A protein has these predicted regions:
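Conserved catalytic cysteine-centered active-site region
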Residues: 34-37, 68-122
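A short linear-motif detector with a strong N-terminal bias
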Residues: 43-44, 75, 103-104, 130-134
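A general secondary-structure junction signal
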Residues: 65-68, 127
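Conserved "HGTGT" condensation-loop signature of ketosynthase/thiolase-family condensing enzymes
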Residues: 1-65, 86-87
Length: 138
């Protein structure tokens, strides 16, 4: 097995959960109610937290990648919709990398080559999922 080493660092992370909760005995589940929150809302809140944790601003980012199992829609891609919310007016590229459950790992691997090759210095990867809208919307 070949070992490949990358020279990159995860500077920060952020999370966001839906406001609506459902409790089953001793477990709490979070779900998005249609019309109240969106996948883009959750992504924007997670990005805000990640940038704060890293001590960065959106203007420090060279590329925005959405790495989710299910995107909001095919065209424009989810990353473009997130870009519109968190990076409006900035000219950084935005792209989706979707490999279902492994999207984040695939995105991290892919952007590591772009960073190593000098194309980008700081890439923001965000994964946002809203399974509750498709699994039991009522």
């Amino acid at each position: 097995m070949t070992t490949v080493k990358r020279h990159l660092q995860i500077k920060g992370y952020g999370t966001a959960l839906p406001a609506h909760t459902v409790t089953f005995k001793d477990q709490t589940r979070y779900r998005v109610k249609e019309g109240e929150e969106t996948q883009i809302d959750l992504a924007a809140r997670a990005i805000e937290a990640a940038l704060k944790h890293a001590g960065l601003e959106m203007t420090d980012i060279d590329c925005l990648v959405s790495a989710s199992a299910v995107g909001v829609q095919p065209i424009p891609c989810t990353a473009a919709l997130i870009h519109e919310r968190v990076a409006k007016g900035l000219t950084i590229p935005a792209m989706d990398i979707n490999t279902t459950c492994t999207s984040f790992i695939s995105a991290l691997s892919t952007v590591s080559y772009l960073i190593e090759g000098g194309e980008y210095q700081r890439v923001l990867i965000v994964s946002s999922e809203v399974g509750s809208l498709g699994l039991n919307p009522k």
